[in-house]
Amino acid sequence: MPKRPDIQKILVIGSGPIVIGQAAEFDYAGTQACLALKEEGYEVILVNSNPATIMTDPTTADRVYIEPLEPEFVERIIRQERPDALLATLGGQTGLNLAFELDKRGVLRDCGVELLGTKLSAIVQAEDREQFRNLMFELGHGVPESEIVHTLESAWGFAERIGYPIIIRPAYTLGGTGGGIAHDRESFEQIVESGLKASPVTQVLLEKSIAGMKEVEFEVMRDSSDQAIIVCAMENFDPVGVHTGDSIVFAPTQTLSDRDYQMLRSVSLDIIRALGIEGGCNIQFALDPDSFTYYVIEVNPRVSRSSALASKATGYPIAKLAAKVAVGYKLSELKNPVTETSYASFEPALDYVVAKIPRFAFDKFESADRRLGTQMKATGEVMAIGRNLEEALLKAVRSLELGMEELHLPQLSALDTEQLEHGLIHPTDERLFIVYEALRRGYSVETLHQLTKIDRFYLQKLNRIWQAEQQLIKEPLTSERLLEVKRLGFSDVAIARMLSMDTEAVRTKRKEWNIRPVYKMVDTCAAEFASETPYFYGTYEVENEAVKTDRESILVLGSGPIRIGQGVEFDYATVHSIDTIRDAGYEAIIINNNPETVSTDFSISDRLYFEPLTTEDVLEVIENENPLGVIVQFGGQTAINLAASLEANGVKILGTTLEDIDRAEDRKAFEATLSAERLAQPPGKTATNVEEAVACANELGYPVLVRPSYVLGGRAMEIVYEQSELERYMRHAVIASKDRPVLIDRYLTGIEIEVDAICDGTDVYIPGIMEHIERAGVHSGDSIAVYPPQRLSEELKQKVVDYTIKLAKAFRIKGLLNIQFVYADDLYVIEVNPRASRTVPFISKVTGLPVARIATQTILGTSLKELGLGTGIHPESDSISVKVPVFSFAKLKEVDPSLGPEMKSTGEVMATDRTLEKALYKGLVAAGMNIALKGNVLMTIADHDKDEAIALAKRFDRLGFRLMATSGTADCLEAEQMRVRRVGKIQEDGETMLSVIERGDVDLIINTTSRDALVTKDGFLIRRTAAEQGTLCLTSLDTVEALLQVIESLSFQTVSIPAFTTFGVMV
């Protein structure tokens, strides 16, 4: 059946901001789907709130709305656009929940909008825990013994009957939000309550724990004619009990017998048919390793994180084909775009092993609870491909950018036996490395299996790596031995450490013995059909399938896994750069290792290498391809950090030179450049030890801002107010050395200003100036950015332009630069980044300028004048746009939600309107804030903020909010004639701050941080409780000011009429 002719216009719902559990995989899926529908001649309307996506570029759909993904906004777009159909299954859980809500409100029926692909009844059957369980019973498929409850009271009976542990799974949530495994009565009560709050239908499934069984996932596709195939079967390294997003995953399945596989394949096809899903679907199983007993854990009736992994692992573009299936195509009518000869109805076959390892943010959040369970905590992931499991695994490990390229984590050597075994039994993000440490200490595979429940097969593979390491150390190095360990995935850096050699000596020896990788093609069919796909992975075999073409090429380095501080914004810039290189007639090559992103879609570049971003792996690709040069500007700090080693090996870095990159990143060279240009900067110094740091701070005067050099996302950055804090920071937060000095600046409070600019070496063009609502001291990535700026005079804006032009020329920028200023009576330069920044997508969207594209054109030699730009600033927009950060604190237990100089947000949203208040309202709503127009405001304010907070409290009071405060703050408010409900401090008897938050009596918390130890502890507990209860908690008074502006703009003023006057005489 060809595409449906009765549909002309389709609305596609995106997934919104990046949060833990829903990341860049939906940008990849949504972009694929929109382009596929446009390819078929449909008019495509897109709504999404995330500006940092290729999906929201004006070229992806016919019309793009960057608006909050809330029913009232999407309803308005539907009534305005009148689409014939809605495609919601590519927008993750957000898209499904929106479709469900729009249907419930009658919007789809009233406007005659058909839901494409998977029908609502199937979504409800898969997402509603009770209906799903009943369907599995009907089909005769096992589900763990379970019960659905809507209240805590009704949950106790199940707990008493079954006993602990119990798994709690909320309905209609993302990444296991609100769920977990309860091991006792106390944790059961806490998780059930949080699960009921997290579920939009107040429903949780209580399930007898099957933790310890094998976890297997099947990615399935089906069309309207009931053709169904398995795209990919994947197996988790970790047994059931760890969320699949936090688990290491291998494809194809490694330990299933043919009988196991065929059984689960049949069950998967049975389930997708019973649900009537048209498109992609992910099914998760628990399999008893000692019998043929299986349980169906859950079904995701949509494109998911696993779909993106399966697409990249197999080369089969699930989202693209799912979109075409949704408009009526059969799988047997669709050509597989990889082979261009076989059809989409052929199940992919793999002749390699794929390993996925999650990337966590615990390097930024050392206080976080690192234990893994059913609630996802990873911010991103890496994927690697090898000819064997060991090679794929070790390539994935070095893709994580953890500062190591092997399984030996040195700090684990300090664990005693009890600590080690605790780490084996209770999984954390370091589980893989802890298992390897146990093998190093002589634990047997069988003992480790009993402690971890990890399949013996995987433990044997890890043991093989350990044995190979031992042989390498103990026996003379021969070409045969070196080839053996290279085939197992050992890197030159790891081999050099094991042999106490220099890395370059290992590389030289390898070349001498002609031990070089070749590149194999990912073709979906294990070479059964001819394939032209330019999608490669490196391995140590004989035949090279990545034969260099005659065309001149340019290599772009990607940004690796998504983490806090380096998100999807960098992939956005990378994709634009690749497009520009292709349009200029060059062959565009990319190296990246993130399966979630658009840049690793094989159709984006001319040649894609799915490889680790290390010096060794990048140099090998360069030797295979011999490009004209390498662009490092768009890959964040990952790519910038490779520039020096690449140039040392004779590689040409295109754009800003390495020397100039270093001048911007090296403190002394940076200060010298600013002094030469007579540009002001906050007074600052560098220190390499505690004594130097104390002397520097005394000279500068407290408070000071301290941070390590060469970091992204403000990692380990703090504002310190006294010597004892500084000494603690120097001893515990950083490892300072002559090579890695600590930067110490006078801390200036003022308006923070941010600029992205493009320079061709002669001219400097500024797309726009952004101001931050939060004053300097809150990381720019966690601040609300406003464009065009609302508080800057024309004179100050001109000064920003003049400074930007001077800086771009002084640092000899070729391409992009990002500058951060602070205005505090004068304009100070905080930092200059000679690369793409996280604001590039936002400034591109609000100005209509494709910033990364223009920057790439200048890198390739086109002048700004030739592009019709020259020197100056782009005309300001009439409308006002805001970029609002989005946080994932509910998923990261023990992380303090207070804002400061270290970045904590995982994503962002954008909103545009005619006034700042309207734009802010939309932005705050899109970021998930519940804006109350009445209710209770709890204020706990540090002494140094009290004067400013009182003025804000008066405005809340005038708006009719009820104020709540502890004694110190309450005294201040009452002294200003405000009514206050007093609540006790945490340690006091009676009604306390925590009890009113836990009871749901508070609509907004304003909590500013104090340096008093007891107050600090109380503040942390308040902020954490607020995060877990879903109560809005603001820690910056600037954000409170912005919120008040919004509430005041939404509130009607009630004013009594004045008395009559007659000719100036009162009547």
From Swiss-Prot:
Mg(2+) 3 binds at Q820, E831. Pathway: Amino-acid biosynthesis; L-arginine biosynthesis; carbamoyl phosphate from bicarbonate: step 1/1; Pyrimidine metabolism; UMP biosynthesis via de novo pathway; (S)-dihydroorotate from bicarbonate: step 1/3. Mn(2+) 3 binds at Q820, E831. GO terms for biological process: 'de novo' UMP biosynthetic process; glutamine metabolic process; L-arginine biosynthetic process. Keywords: Amino-acid biosynthesis, Arginine biosynthesis, ATP-binding, Ligase, Magnesium, Manganese, Metal-binding, Nucleotide-binding, Pyrimidine biosynthesis, Repeat. The keyword Transcription does not apply. One of its GO terms (cellular component) is cytoplasm. Large subunit of the glutamine-dependent carbamoyl phosphate synthetase (CPSase). CPSase catalyzes the formation of carbamoyl phosphate from the ammonia moiety of glutamine, carbonate, and phosphate donated by ATP, constituting the first step of 2 biosynthetic pathways, one leading to arginine and/or urea and the other to pyrimidine nucleotides. The large subunit is composed of 2 ATP-grasp domains that are involved in binding the 2 ATP molecules needed for carbamoyl phosphate synthesis. The N-terminal ATP-grasp domain (referred to as the carboxyphosphate synthetic component) catalyzes the ATP-dependent phosphorylation of hydrogencarbonate to carboxyphosphate and the subsequent nucleophilic attack by ammonia to form a carbamate intermediate. This is Carbamoyl phosphate synthase large chain. It comes from Exiguobacterium sp. (strain ATCC BAA-1283 / AT1b).
